[in-house]
C-alpha cells in the first residue's frame, strides 16, 4: 500500500512526501519583483511545516509585463544572487522549491494604463475588462525565448525545477482555449495548433536547462464554460503531447478566471464551499484520473484537496501520485507535520477565499 509519506523521485527531485504547496501569489515581493524578508519568511515557515516541495507564486518573465502588484520577477539576471540565497535557506529547512513562471496576458490588472497587453487574439477579459492585442509571430518568438531565458535563471538560482503556468486564463491557457484564441494561422484553430505555443515554450526551455532539470506544467483540465472553451479531451491531448516531448510532471487544475460565467458558477480554480462534504473535495480528480491512466508521467492533483483519507484513497485506487494544497497551508503552514505526527484531522481552511483579500494573502482567522 502506498502512503502519502512515501519517499519518491519526481524526475531528479527527491520527494520526502507526496505533498506540494501549490503556487499562490502573496504580493510580498518588492515593486520590481525582488525578494523581501517578508516573502522569504512565508516560504521558510512552509518549509519548517513539513511540506515536501513548495511551488512559488508565479514569477513574471518580462520586465514590462507584471500581471499583479508585488509578484515575484525572474526577467533578468539581477534576481539570481538573491534567489540563490533564498533557495539555500529552503533547502536547509528540508524542502524542495520550484518556481512557477508566467506571462499574464489580459489577466494583467496592475498599471495597465496605455501598455500593450499581448494575447492570442484581440479580446477582453470579461472579469477585469483588460484588453489584449493579437500577437504577431515575432511577438510569439520573443515570448518563447523570454520563457526559456527565465527558466535558465530559475536553474542558476538553485531552484529544484520550473513550472509553466498553463491555467486559469493566463497567456498559455488563452492560447489553448478556443473561447479566446480566434487565430487563423498555425497558432489557432485545431488543438494541435492552439497547443503549438506551449509546445514551443517547453522545447525552448528544455534546450536551455538541459535534459535533467525538471520542467512541470500547471495545466487547465477545462475552462468549465458551457460553450466554446477548452475541453477535457483537448486538454488531454496537450498533456499527452507534452509527456511525449519529455515534461517531468503535470499539475492538474481548471477553470478560467477571465470568464464571467465560470466565476459566477463557482467553477474557478479556488472554489468555495469545499468543506461542506467530502464529495466536493479534490474537484479536478476525474480529469486527473483519466490523465494518469493515459500517461506515464507523474500527475499532481490540485484543487480542493482537504481530507487526508480522501487523498490516500485516491493515491491507492488511481495512478495519481502527488497532491497539491494552497489554501489549507495558508491557514496551517504546519499541516503536513501535524498529519505526519498522526493528527489526521481535516484542515482548518473553510475555503472562504477571504485570504485573497488580505495583505500577504493570510488566513483571516490567523490575523491578530
Model-identified regions with their sequence ranges:
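Flavin-dependent oxidoreductase catalytic cores
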Residues: 1-368
